[in-house]
Amino acid sequence: MTTQAPPTSLLPLSPEQLARLQAAVGEFSPTQMAWLSGYFWGMVNQQPGAVASPAVAAPPPVTVTLISASQTGNARRLAEQLRDDLLAAQLSVNLVNAGDYKFKQIAQERLLVVVASTQGEGEPAEEAVALHKFLFSKKAPKLSETAFAVFGLGDTSYEHFCQAGKDFDSKLAELGAQRLLDRVDADVEYQVQAQQWRQQVVATLQAKVPAQSTAPTQSTTPAAAAITSGGTTTVSPYSKTAPLTAQLSVQQKVTGRNSEKDVRHIEIDLGDSGLRYQPGDALGVWFDNDPALVEELLALLWLKGDEPVSIDGQNMPLAQALLSHLELTQNTTLIVDKYAALSRDETLIALLADKPALQLYAKNTPFVDMVRQAPSDLNADQLVGLLRPLTPRLYSIASSQAETENEVHITVGVVRYDIDGRARSGGASGYLADRLEVDGDIRVFIEHNDNFRLPANPETPVIMIGPGTGIAPFRAFMQQREVDGASGKNWLFFGNPHFTEDFLYQVEWQRYVKEGVLTRIDLAWSRDQAHKIYVQDKLREQGAELWNWIQQGAHIYVCGDANRMAKDVEQVLLDVVALHGAMDAEQADEYLSELRQARRYQRDVY
């Protein structure tokens, strides 16, 4: 922990007054100082015989600004917990979504706490992109009167672990702000670190800011609020930690038999649960690992599966822990490092010195295949200590309750690959496609995403860019726009390898076009000709018309791959704005940032 003097702005004295006071009291003894304190107290409280003085107004309460930069909801939930802690400690707090934060006011912040997640290749959460760009621009102000703390959320299975948190921490310090606490970089299993950090933040702020004598103020929004079809706000009893047990009603392959992709349309019956969602939200899916994978791992380690282990204080057989509580299909560099030490495998130990090769190995080699390639004799507790907790997967919702009512639809790309001749599949996608039977129970919850919403005005034009399974939320958008009778124009850009095999929801899109609900559709089939064509090529081709729609107030939505597609699409948008808007590169970038701030450029990328 780093301890520093509070900024002078937190005191009810100006720097000049503070300097004069410090100079004056230097010549007094402790006894004289004690007498003076009573003398000043008497002046303030107008005791008999005290020298009258003008009443001094109490300084306004110092508010802690708490910024949540969340991608999948974890940062938001942690920020909400910290907000509650600060309020309980009688401190005033303003919790704000990074996408709603007026970042030009950051120079006025005195106490700033940032909870930041990282997405893709070290990029900030989508809602924090504009703030991140501003802080790293020439317009960023000096922050010498600001004290701050940063908690970074990330995943060690990615190369740029917690990079967004590191960026915010280093840039705030570079701009002159003072650290209240050292930055925390937390992995997927972040709860223990988060609880300790919350306690440290509260204690540190209590030492710097007097508790409010009146009720502390807050500015925030409900955590689990959902909007019903009638427009009222409800609080759902279901969450990531308390999911709804629903039933699978439809599981259908929507790619052709000769397609290189296996994409499934999934429909889940929510029954009379009352679970509500909006177009743009995601569905969280809890899953069980493949029993065959569990048996394979146990056999490789010469374990029976009935060995007792403890998971979060709950005792259970090892086989049950591997099936339902521990991650088996994702590896990380940290796991490789620990396993190399236990196995003493020379190949793995040598790999640790080559960071790029280590990252690639962890990404492409599931834990069970690492054990097969580098055998070791682990006991049950050692195995459990190596593996990460199972986490749910999020899927963009492909339906609107205005049409499907008590159902929720998702579009799932099934992950399939071979390693050393052995077929492997993704944890959740394999569960949904291969192991979960129709009418079977499935645990789900809604992850609300207020950063991917249809425009409030039904007359506003909408541009949707979603290749592959990125088309999912736009199916929900079109269902909603049709039910609402929205008069605004709709334009879809979709792409996949082959027209005949990979045109997801083809009949539905054709109907929308025929009935005039979908104004335009541009399709990119990357493998149907000698040269590859992607959605970004179609965007560039339609640049002039695209600019016309933007000038008419269109909202732009992008869904799909964050690492390649989304970056390429953004570059084309910048090029279109520069060319047709007669701007240079810097002006185009600022223009796109303004669209993002106005919620006219929204992305759901992963």
Curated annotation (Swiss-Prot):
Belongs to the NADPH-dependent sulphite reductase flavoprotein subunit CysJ family. Keywords: Amino-acid biosynthesis, Cysteine biosynthesis, Electron transport, FAD, Flavoprotein, FMN, NADP, Oxidoreductase, Transport. This is Sulfite reductase [NADPH] flavoprotein alpha-component. FAD binds at residues 329, 363, 393-396, 411-413, 417, 426-429, 606. HAMAP family: CysJ. Its cofactor is FAD; FMN. One of its GO terms (biological process) is sulfate assimilation. Alpha(8)-beta(8). The alpha component is a flavoprotein, the beta component is a hemoprotein. Residues 212-235 are annotated as: Disordered. It comes from Yersinia pestis. The gene is cysJ. Residues 64-202 form the Flavodoxin-like domain.
